[in-house]
Amino acid sequence: MSLNRGKVLDAALRLADEQGLAALSMRKVAAAVGVEAMSLYNHVSNKGDLLDGLTARVFEEVDVPDPALPWESRVRLLADGLYASFARHPVVVRALAAQDANPRSAGALRVIDALLHALLDAGLSEEATARAYRSLLGMLFGSVLTGAAGGVAAKAERAEPVGAYFRRMATPSELPSLHRVLPALESGDCVQDFEYQLNLLIGGLGSAS
């Protein structure tokens, strides 16, 4: 089976998901697709191009909604699609947040364009659209990385677990609000939290337009 850029990027994404970006190398990707490292340069220019390509792959997993739908529905569909794709590949979110990668492909740009189109259709100016777009990305990145951190097994060792410390310190007399809300904080759901934020954002955009 002949090698192409898509197969290289798919292999790189699987490797990054399994081992993290720090472990991603041209040599390891080459081994994953069964070729010598030099053969990869027929399909990707360098590691930066590789990172951009696998990031674009994640954006391309998102379906672009019908532009005839109301803008609120389009924003929600795109945001939920991006959340689901990012949650499958949180390693890419880390690369985006660190500005180590950019989604460089026509398919990825169509997703971004569709989101901006929906925001413009909300009646926002170009400047407000840019702010809303950045706000949504910040929500996406934060929610996905928070969820991913919750699943990490290896954490810094402490004499007292963080949860136990908060419960011990948050007494009704000293920290009454923290004491009251702490059980809800400890039982949070990242997906529900993201939907809550998204509802606030869409509601706020509707009021601002």
Q: Over which residues does each language-model region extend?
A:
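Helix-turn-helix
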Residues: 7, 11-49, 53
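Amphipathic alpha-helical interaction segments
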Residues: 7, 49, 77, 110, ...
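Short, basic, alpha-helical segments at the C-terminal edge of helix-turn-helix-like DNA-binding modules
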Residues: 55-61
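Hydrophobic alpha-helical connector segments
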Residues: 63-110, 126, 133
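Hydrophobic, amphipathic alpha-helical faces that serve as interaction scaffolds
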Residues: 91-92, 141, 145
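Amphipathic alpha-helical packing segments from all-alpha helical-bundle domains
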Residues: 97-123, 127-134, 145, 167-176
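C-terminal peripheral helix-coil segments that are non-catalytic and often amphipathic
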Residues: 121, 149-209
